[in-house]
Amino acid sequence: QVKRADKESKEGIIKAIASDDGKTIAMTEVNTETDFVAKTDNFKKFAEAVTRQVLAGVEDPVAAMKDELMTIVSQTGENVKIRRTCRYVLSGTGQIAFYIHMGGKVGVVVEVGCGKEETAHSPAFGELVHDLTLQIAAAAPRYVTSDEVPADAIETEKEIARNSDRFKGKPDNIVENALKGIVNKFFSDVCLVNQPFVKEPKQTVTDVLKACEKATGDKITIKRFTRFQLGAA
């Protein structure tokens, strides 16, 4: 017989809650074994309670919710886990926002900064921030900019390309030139600002940022984001 704690918990829900003033957001992923349990009211209430603990600043929700966790495990007969959490507090001028996609299968939190308070409250800025949450949910970037990409990740991409059949017997200068294009393509896959904009793929996210800067007369910076995908690493 498989022990309860060894059973795979890959179903569940991603939940996010914002504080009333919009300056704090908590997001959690709570897992269970079956989609059936994940859709029950008891499980959803438990996930919400965990998220509210994180929102309140509780650093170890697993310890704080120990009794409730034991209760939900005994109610469902499944291995329920509080898998991961994040908590954003707005720093400086700007906005934080969240988006839950596919009924709790994907969750995103983003923080975007600007220079002026009036920008932070403008419709153009609000739309940009919302669009960025949709972008991150749909396109799954790993970094904000190419500056954040570790050198070894870039080197790995180059190495894979160098060893591919298309470059066998080609002169080094041709290979090196081609590698620049390959690295740029890699950046457009994994870096948020380099990605094609999901609403208008002929533009990049950088183009959309610049348009908002022009509209608001302000400097806008994507500070950070977190993306949870249910059951993924």
Predicted segments with their positions:
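N-terminal assembly/interaction segments in proteins that build large macromolecular machines
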Residues: 1-233
